[in-house]
């Protein structure tokens, strides 16, 4: 290829001084990384963390993000560093509970998002078991830098939540905005009873949910905020 014969792909083409030969300089795109997140990660490309087979909680939960075996403490959590890339987390189950993000007993998980990329979460269950966007067991701790968008939570059953707490002493903090929409259950819809459908549901004592930015929970039948435990607190929008 020479300067006189170049007819296509003009953008980003340079020519060598020595012989006038054209060259196209580019950085190859990184392939998207797929599969569940099961331990600390620092992303090097867009991350599509999807779980489709039983994995978390000794195989009783299908999850796209959970701590498989990393010892964690308050000062040494399992860190998922998005490193400026996109992150989508999904659970797709046909026989077990679907929890896109699952935080087990005594676990500490932190999602680092310095670039402020949107974190997308979906959870679907073609079985009648529960589906949750984020699920926290007892004494579990989750910190995420948002924005976070839980765009779909669906089950054929009656129990579905954008964020669900089940156990005492757990805490979730989203530093940024939170959107929860399209939470539903086929059985709940059929019966016209939506007691198990919630945006944020807390059933443990001494639990707390904090969102520092704006919150939009809409587009479904059921309760936006549901608390059933003693001394549990939901604080949204800095209030």
Model-derived features: positions:
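All-beta strand scaffolds that present successive hydrophobic residues in beta-strands
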Residues: 28, 33-34, 74-75, 79-82, ...
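Extracellular beta-strand/beta-solenoid scaffold signature
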Residues: 1-14, 21-23, 32, 38, ...
């Amino acid at each position: 290829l020479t300067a006189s014969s170049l007819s296509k792909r003009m953008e980003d083409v340079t020519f060598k001084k020595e012989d006038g030969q054209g060259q196209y300089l580019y950085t190859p795109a990184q392939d998207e990384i797929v599969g569940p997140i099961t331990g600390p990660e620092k992303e090097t490309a867009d991350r599509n963390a999807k779980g489709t087979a039983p994995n978390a909680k000794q195989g009783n939960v299908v999850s796209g993000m959970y701590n498989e075996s990393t010892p964690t403490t308050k000062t040494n959590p399992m860190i998922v560093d998005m490193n400026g890339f996109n992150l989508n987390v999904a659970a797709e189950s046909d026989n077990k509970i679907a929890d896109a993000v699952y935080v087990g007993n005594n676990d500490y998980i932190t999602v680092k998002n310095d670039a402020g990329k949107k974190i997308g979460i979906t959870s679907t269950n073609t079985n009648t078991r529960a589906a949750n966007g984020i699920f926290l067991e007892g004494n579990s701790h989750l910190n995420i830098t948002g924005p976070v968008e839980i765009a779909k939570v669906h089950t054929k059953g009656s129990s579905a939540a954008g964020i669900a707490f089940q156990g005492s002493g757990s805490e979730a903090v989203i530093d940024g905005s939170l959107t929860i929409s399209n939470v539903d259950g086929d059985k709940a819809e059929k019966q016209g009873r939506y007691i198990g459908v919630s945006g944020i549901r807390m059933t443990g004592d001494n639990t707390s949910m904090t969102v520092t930015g704006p919150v939009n929970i809409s587009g479904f039948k059921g309760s936006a905020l549901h608390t059933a435990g003693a001394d549990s607190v939901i604080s949204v929008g800095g209030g």
